C-alpha cells in the first residue's frame, strides 16, 4: 500500500486522444509535497506517512510545529495529512513526492471538501419530487410535504430529511482514471469531476477497488531533499585547491 499526495484543484479542461475523442479532465497540482514524519508500529501502533504541501508563514506556525519541521529539514507546510502505508512503502523523511508517483491509466480515489450551496430545499438537497403543479396546490410546489405522523408518534423523528445546509462536507470520489501527468509542472490530470472548488485541497491515493498496475513505482516516485547535500558536494572539490594555494 503506497502513500498518497496532497494536491490543489486547479480546474477542469479537456484533452484529446489519438482517435480525436475529447476527455474531460480535472487538473490537480502538487506544490512541493514532502514527507514530514513517519508513523511506526513501535512508536505509534500503525505505519503511515505524514506529508505536507504548500508554504506556510512562520508566524502562523506554532513553535512545536516549527521544531518538527526543523527535525525533518523541510519548510513549514500549510496543509498536512497522513496516509497509511505498508512497511516496504515508507518514503524517506524530507523527500518530495512528484507527479509521476501516479502513472497514466491507473485509477485513483480523490477526497476533498464539497462546494458549499448554502441553505437548500428538500428537492435540491435530497432529490424530493415536490408537490403537484395544479389540483389545488398553491405556492407550496417545492415543499417537502408532511414531516411526521399524527398524535402517534406526535413528533418528527431525528434524521428526517428536511431543508438545511448543503455542501462543505468531506467527499470521496472513487475510481477516477489518471489520463496524464506532468512532473515538471507538478500536474496530474484525472478523468471526470473532483469534489470541491478551484483552489481547494485534494487528497489523491491509489484506488482501493482497482488492482494496482504492475509498472507503478514502488515505494513511490520522489526526489530526495538534497539541497544541503548538493551544496556540500560543490564545496568539496574546492578544499584541495585551497590547501595547494596555502
From Swiss-Prot:
Key words, A-Z: Methylation, Ribonucleoprotein, Ribosomal protein, RNA-binding, rRNA-binding
GO cellular component annotations of the record: cytosolic large ribosomal subunit
Region Disordered: start-end pairs: 140-162, 214-246
Xref: Pfam families: Ribosomal_L3
PTM: Methylated by PrmB.
Biased composition (Low complexity): 234-246
Gene Ontology biological process terms, A to Z: translation
Entry keyword annotation includes Lipid metabolism: no
Record InterPro entries: Ribosomal_uL3, Ribosomal_uL3_bac/org-type, Ribosomal_uL3_CS, Transl_B-barrel_sf
GO molecular function: rRNA binding; structural constituent of ribosome
Domain of life where this protein originates: Bacteria
Modified residues (N5-methylglutamine): 151
UniProt KW DNA-binding keyword: no
PANTHER family, A to Z: 50S RIBOSOMAL PROTEIN L3 (PTHR11229), LARGE RIBOSOMAL SUBUNIT PROTEIN UL3C (PTHR11229:SF16)
Family as reported in the entry's similarity comment: Belongs to the universal ribosomal protein uL3 family.
Subunit structure: Part of the 50S ribosomal subunit. Forms a cluster with proteins L14 and L19.
Its job: One of the primary rRNA binding proteins, it binds directly near the 3'-end of the 23S rRNA, where it nucleates assembly of the 50S subunit.
This protein's name: Large ribosomal subunit protein uL3
Source organism of this protein record: Methylorubrum extorquens (strain CM4 / NCIMB 13688) (Methylobacterium extorquens)
Amino acid at each position: 500500500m503506497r502513500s498518497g499526495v496532497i494536491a490543489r484543484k486547479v480546474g477542469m479542461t479537456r484533452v484529446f486522444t489519438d482517435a480525436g475523442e475529447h476527455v474531460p479532465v480535472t487538473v490537480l497540482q502538487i506544490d512541493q509535497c514532502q514527507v514530514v514524519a513517519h508513523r511506526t508500529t513501535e512508536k505509534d501502533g500503525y505505519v503511515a506517512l505524514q506529508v505536507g504541501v504548500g508554504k506556510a508563514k512562520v508566524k502562523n506556525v506554532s513553535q512545536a510545529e516549527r521544531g518538527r519541521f526543523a527535525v525533518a529539514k523541510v519548510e513549514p507546510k500549510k496543509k498536512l495529512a497522513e496516509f497509511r502505508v505498508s512497511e516496504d512503502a515508507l518514503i524517506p523523511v524530507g523527500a518530495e513526492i512528484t507527479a509521476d508517483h501516479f502513472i497514466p491509466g491507473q485509477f485513483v480515489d480523490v477526497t476533498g471538501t464539497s462546494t458549499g450551496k448554502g441553505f437548500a430545499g428538500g428537492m435540491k438537497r435530497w432529490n424530493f419530487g415536490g408537490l403537484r403543479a395544479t389540483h389545488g396546490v398553491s405556492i407550496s410546489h417545492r415543499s417537502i410535504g408532511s414531516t411526521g405522523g399524527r398524535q402517534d408518534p406526535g413528533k418528527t423523528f431525528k434524521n428526517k430529511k428536511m431543508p438545511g445546509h448543503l455542501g462543505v462536507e468531506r467527499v470521496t470520489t472513487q475510481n477516477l482514471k489518471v489520463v496524464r501527468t506532468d512532473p515538471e509542472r507538478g500536474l496530474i490530470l484525472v478523468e471526470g469531476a473532483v469534489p470541491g472548488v478551484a483552489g481547494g485541497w485534494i487528497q489523491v491515493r491509489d484506488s482501493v477497488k482497482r488492482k494496482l498496475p504492475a509498472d507503478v513505482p514502488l515505494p513511490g516516485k520522489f526526489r530526495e531533499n538534497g539541497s544541503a547535500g548538493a551544496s556540500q558536494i560543490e564545496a568539496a572539490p574546492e578544499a584541495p585547491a585551497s590547501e595547494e594555494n596555502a
